[in-house]
Amino acid sequence: MINTEQSHTKHWVTSSLLDIEIDCLGRQAALKLIEDTLNDHQTQPRAQALQIVTMNAEMVYAATQDPALLSLLQQAEVVLPDGIGVVWALERQGVSVERVPGIDLVKALLQKPLKIA
């Protein structure tokens, strides 16, 4: 079931796929969020950490079989649609979302200059 809505705690649109909230951030917005969080940790060492999951269809299926995994996915601060199966499922419900592969995020972050306070 997909419910597209503006999250109460987030400033972007989210959708729900089998009781897992998916963040409809594109690659650039996800990178900015990560960079901002890293910068916050530079200036405020006690700033909140950010748990990011890049979810694929296998993870969705596994979560239907494993309540502990489902709970972890539901508690993550950001869940991005990594796999094309997740993107397809969201689009079948009328939600247009960009695929955001985790490996692409890591590569992009590693190309950024390192700032040490």
Which role does the model predict for each range below?
Residues 2-99, 103-107:
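N-terminal nucleotide/polyanion-binding subdomain common to many enzyme families
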Residues 114-117:
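An alpha-beta-alpha
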